[in-house]
UniProtKB/Swiss-Prot annotation:
Keywords: ATP-binding, Chaperone, Metal-binding, Nucleotide-binding, Zinc. This is ATP-dependent Clp protease ATP-binding subunit ClpX. InterPro entries: AAA+_ATPase (IPR003593), ATP-dep_Clp_protease_ClpX (IPR050052), ATPase_AAA_core (IPR003959), Clp_ATPase_C (IPR019489), Clp_protease_ATP-bd_su_ClpX (IPR004487), ClpX_bact (IPR046425), P-loop_NTPase (IPR027417), Znf_CppX_C4 (IPR010603). One of its GO terms (molecular function) is protein dimerization activity. PROSITE patterns: CLPX_ZB. Zn(2+) binds at residues 15, 18, 37, 40. GO terms for cellular component: HslUV protease complex. The gene is clpX. ATP-dependent specificity component of the Clp protease. It directs the protease to specific substrates. Can perform chaperone functions in the absence of ClpP. Residues 3-56 form the ClpX-type ZB domain. The lineage of its organism: Bacteria, Pseudomonadati, Pseudomonadota, Betaproteobacteria, Burkholderiales. Transmembrane segments: none annotated. It comes from Methylibium petroleiphilum (strain ATCC BAA-1232 / LMG 22953 / PM1). GO terms for biological process: cell division; proteolysis involved in protein catabolic process. ATP binds at residues 125-132. The keyword Transmembrane does not apply.
Length: 423
């Protein structure tokens, strides 16, 4: 019994586990008709720590949550073909960013060294994989992710989206969990389209260009953004949610068409004289020129100096080659060929795409100058009629796509079960 009578008429309480009285222990905690002392609680904690060491250690959890740069790049390799320098730069930048978050959260006292945030700027032609890189990173790290189009943003008070709408979309993606949203990734696409229209400031308002850049400044650097709750502005009496953007990683991407001319003009001015290396403009690829980009080039292009300073990590992506296009069609986890083979398999039909057809698709996509985005439209156009007729056709076992289908727009070869059996 946990209760016994003492010499005086008062009740003395005893631990139900070790039998010690309330006078022999520091604390006795009551439960439903039972008591437990502080010594027994400490003993229970020791047993749990010994038997479940993995769950009690924060180090392992931190390690599993935070892949190292090599693992990040290996995951990117599964989805993104080529662009090795950009993948390495991104892997290191993202690793350092989330290491910084662990440093901020794990340290209770004020540290001497304060780690600053390094946002990322991706420069590369259309269809080179900028958005895919950001999407793959967010999927790997299991953090909220949102893509914002810079061309739809305007200054506050004008028709269009405010920059705070980006944070609201991020909140929506994580079901309005503020803590998760504050560790998310924001990808701002077409950042080059909000460049200043001219080098010298204009007297007229540039509400979708420099004005948006000014509005993005504090958001990218870190500020308390006021976001309406789930009900939006329909309930004006509700308090706005306060989101700290200090720990949100911002990745900005753009094609920066014309930036290569700015870089070349700068390099040509610096390369004057007998010792200067003479090289024709046509000899160098745009991707090679982009690798030499300096902050002053981005400012000359039309980004304001303050925004350039807040995007310290610059990764450049190159134009895709024919071989890279063929690899994109077949190698990634969600490769286009695998997707169409899965669609045809749902109808019980095998899809075979010959190597000559893959080369023809890659060449056609390169001619369109839309990067990897052009691959799907070419595949869709080549297989459209077959996908329309196939569900109502009997006996088809295989569809074969060759270079003639791509180049001459002929119908793919159909192999029937009877023909295959007789062969």
């Amino acid at each position: 019994m946990p209760e016994k009578k003492g010499s005086s008429s008062e009740k003395v309480l005893y631990c139900s586990f070790c039998g010690k009285s309330q006078h022999e222990v520091k604390k006795l905690i009551a439960g439903p008709s039972v008591f437990i002392c502080d010594e027994c609680i400490e003993l229970c904690n020791d047993i749990i720590r010994d038997e479940v060491p993995a769950e009690s250690g924060d180090a392992k959890a931190a390690k599993s949550d935070l892949p190292v740069p090599g693992e990040i790049k290996a995951s990117l390799d599964q989805y993104v073909i080529g662009q090795e320098p950009a993948k390495r730069t991104l892997a290191v930048a993202v690793y350092n960013h989330y290491k910084r978050l662990k440093h901020v959260q794990g340290v209770g006292k004020k540290e001497d060294v304060e780690l600053a945030k390094s946002n990322i700027l991706l420069i590369g032609p259309t269809g080179s994989g900028k958005t895919l890189l950001a999407q793959t990173l967010a999927r790997l790290l299991n953090v909220p992710f949102v893509i914002a189009d810079a061309t739809t943003l305007t200054e506050a008070g004008y028709v269009g989206e405010d920059v705070e709408n980006i944070i609201q979309k991020l909140l929506q993606n994580c079901n309005y969990e503020v803590e998760r949203a504050q560790r998310g990734i924001v990808y701002i696409d077409e950042i080059d389209k909000i460049s200043r229209k001219a080098d010298n400031p204009s007297i007229t308002r540039d509400v979708s260009g420099e004005g948006v850049q000014q509005a993005l400044l504090k958001l990218v650097e870190g500020t308390m953004a006021s976001v309406p709750p789930q009900g939006g502005r329909k309930h004006p009496n509700q308090d706005f949610l306060q989101i700290d953007t200090t720990n949100i990683l911002f990745i900005c991407g753009g094609a920066f068409d014309g930036l290569e001319k700015v870089i070349q003009n700068r390099s040509e001015k610096s390369g004057i004289g007998f010792g200067a290396s003479v090289q024709s403009k046509t000899e160098r690829k745009v991707s090679e020129v982009f690798r030499e980009v300096e902050p002053e080039d981005l400012i000359k292009f039309g980004l304001i100096p303050e925004l350039v300073g807040r995007l310290p990590v610059v990764a450049t992506l190159g134009e895709l080659t024919e071989d890279a296009m063929v690899q994109i069609l077949t190698e990634p986890k969600n490769a286009l060929v695998k997707q169409y083979q899965k669609l045809f398999a749902m109808d019980g039909v095998e899809l075979e795409i010959r190597p000559s057809a893959l080369t023809a698709i890659a060449q056609k996509a390169l001619a369109r100058k839309t990067g990897a985005r052009g691959l799907r439209s070419i595949m869709e156009h080549s297989l459209m009629d077959t996908m329309f007729d196939l569900p109502t056709m009997d006996g088809v076992q295989k569809v074969v796509l060759d270079e003639h289908t791509i180049e001459e727009h002929t119908k793919p070869l159909l192999v029937y079960r009877e023909q295959k059996a007789s062969a």
